[in-house]
Amino acid sequence: MSDSQTLVVKLGTSVLTGGSRRLNRAHIVELVRQCAQLHAAGHRIVIVTSGAIAAGREHLGYPELPATIASKQLLAAVGQSRLIQLWEQLFSIYGIHIGQMLLTRADMEDRERFLNARDTLRALLDNHIVPVINENDAVATAEIKVGDNDNLSALAAILAGADKLLLLTDQQGLFTADPRSNPQAELIKDVYGVDDALRSIAGDSVSGLGIGGMSTKLQAADVACRAGIDTIIASGSKPGVIGDVMEGISVGTRFHAQASPLENRKRWIFGAPPAGEITVDEGATAAMLERGSSLLPKGIKSVTGNFSRGEVIRICNLQGRDIAHGVSRYNSDALRRIAGHHSQQIDAILGYEYGPVAVHRDDMITR
């Protein structure tokens, strides 16, 4: 084995169930065995687990429930405890303790809570405890959810200071087309940057048990790679896949980490789920992307959502493309009032000002 590394392993519902309606315990046993072997060799392992809703549905005998958020949260509340018990039971076979962390988007949006979560996660790792992370589906609403465990795993990798992120799925990796419908589809083995062409070929999962598809895995890979973390999408059913990844053996699709990774504050900005969105005109788009300029109120066309000063927001061009994330200097109501106006007019419009820019270039990451 090489020197100690930190690996985040994300296990989707389709991997944990094998595409069935219940958890595939035999397969989970094998995945834990691989993780335990790496743990014994001195590596630091973080698990990001899906499967709470599937576990709850199985435990309750597959009840007929309405397709509502409340039903999903009911199943998650029942299943989360069952799921963590399973992880605890299996890792205890190898004398390994686990620590559960349930996160929501609010833990990532707020810088102080982000740092607290980071400190907790790293304390677990420093004490040779395997963190088991999931989104707090039992209480999270659409407004406070990260949205899927792919993006959650990228955030976990940033929190952990991971070397590698492994996204295990029901596919071998990213293909040039959907291999389920196109026999000519070829596996893409290496990716050196996520672009629009790559996003256009990403399809969706068809397991029906989870909410993450290949597009969310691309988002996660983009975030992790820009933070300096190699990301691999591979099949969870491939024998020895976790060990192979740690050994550097080529499996699935490898997204190579950015050579000059973002510094810590910008990792948070890039990874934090946006609290709102603004659309900017062509002049502002060119200024930010081509000249690295700050965003001025004059270039703002519209503001979507309600957010506070200091929160991370998404910046889109007129075609709706996500071109940047940044920390807003003004809240959403203030931005709506000063949108399209020159910076010299801010004080006259609002009665106060926090400077001439809406988002400063030092608080911005372009996509």
From Swiss-Prot:
Catalyzes the transfer of a phosphate group to glutamate to form L-glutamate 5-phosphate. Its main location: cytoplasm. It catalyses: L-glutamate + ATP = L-glutamyl 5-phosphate + ADP. PANTHER family: GLUTAMATE 5-KINASE, ISOPENTENYL PHOSPHATE KINASE. Gene3D superfamilies: Acetylglutamate kinase-like (3.40.1160.10), PUA domain (2.30.130.10). Keywords: Amino-acid biosynthesis, ATP-binding, Cytoplasm, Kinase, Nucleotide-binding, Proline biosynthesis, Transferase. Substrate binds at residues 50, 137, 149. HAMAP family: ProB (MF_00456). Pathway: Amino-acid biosynthesis; L-proline biosynthesis; L-glutamate 5-semialdehyde from L-glutamate: step 1/2. GO terms for biological process: L-proline biosynthetic process. It comes from Salmonella paratyphi B (strain ATCC BAA-1250 / SPB7). It is found in: Cytoplasm. InterPro entries: AceGlu_kinase-like_sf (IPR036393), Asp/Glu/Uridylate_kinase (IPR001048), G5K_ProB (IPR041739), Glu/AcGlu_kinase (IPR001057), Glu_5kinase (IPR011529), Glu_5kinase/COase_Synthase (IPR005715), Glutamate_5-kinase_CS (IPR019797), PUA (IPR002478). SUPFAM superfamilies: Carbamate kinase-like (SSF53633), PUA domain-like (SSF88697). This is Glutamate 5-kinase. GO terms for molecular function: ATP binding; glutamate 5-kinase activity; RNA binding. Its EC number is 2.7.2.11. ATP binds at residues 10, 169-170.
